[in-house]
Every structure is written in structure tokens, then in C-alpha cells.
Amino acid sequence: MTTPSRKPPADPQKFAVAVGPSAIDGHGAFAAEPIPARRKIGEIRGESISVREAWRRARRQARIMIVEVSPRRAVDASRSTDPLRYTNHSCAPNSVLHIRRGRIEIFSMREVAAGEELTIDYGDSHHQGQLACRCGAPRCVGRL
């Protein structure tokens, strides 16, 4: 009897991304190669948890790396090795986050140069206006 072979999970990163010091906040995700406009950069992976557990963890963590993917489920990327988990907020982002079938995908909105920090708009976040925005964009809203 033969054992069926299992394919390793597909690499969720379509473009090379590196982690480095960010002028926005702590660490950031940076394009390690040029990325064309409107292309999938990659995915953020992590532990699938309930939204209730996500809120519990968010209250005790200094750095939140949790994304709600449905009304009941969230992904905690705190222990993930995916560099995109370090994607910071900007009021003038170069990328956008899409949730599709429970997957967290990041797409470029415009051409992104090698070495440029990848940013998304966190939108309605759980910070409830309590976190100062440090993106430095000309039209920064000031708070998350």
C-alpha cells in the first residue's frame, strides 16, 4: 500500500518582502524587488481563532497582529513567519488588504519600488481612535 504524497503548502508570497526598521512604527514590511501595480504581493498567515479570542488577545498585546476574516473568525499572525504581518498603516497606502475565503491577501495599488515600505489603510480598527497615527502622509488623519 502506498502513502499518498502531500504537497507542501504553496508559498503565499508572490513577491520578495523583507522586514526592516520602519519610520512609521517599529518594524515594517518592505518590497525586496519592484512590484507592479495591481498585483498580489502575498498573504498573511497565522493561527485561526475566534473573534472573541481575538479581542481577548488584543487587550493584552502591545503589538496587535490580528485580522478579522469573518464575523466569527480571526487570524492571529503574532507567531507567523510571514513578513507581511509587519505591514504598517498609512493614510496614503501603496497596498490594500483583501479577505477572500478566509485568506488575508495584500495587493499593490500602484507600482512599489524595491526598498519601499508596504503600507495599507487599517480602516475601522479596534484602536477606536486611541492610537496616534505616525504615517507622516500629507493628509494623515492623526488617529487610528
Predicted regions and their residues:
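Conserved catalytic SET/PR domain of SAM-dependent protein methyltransferases, capturing the structural core
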Residues: 1-144
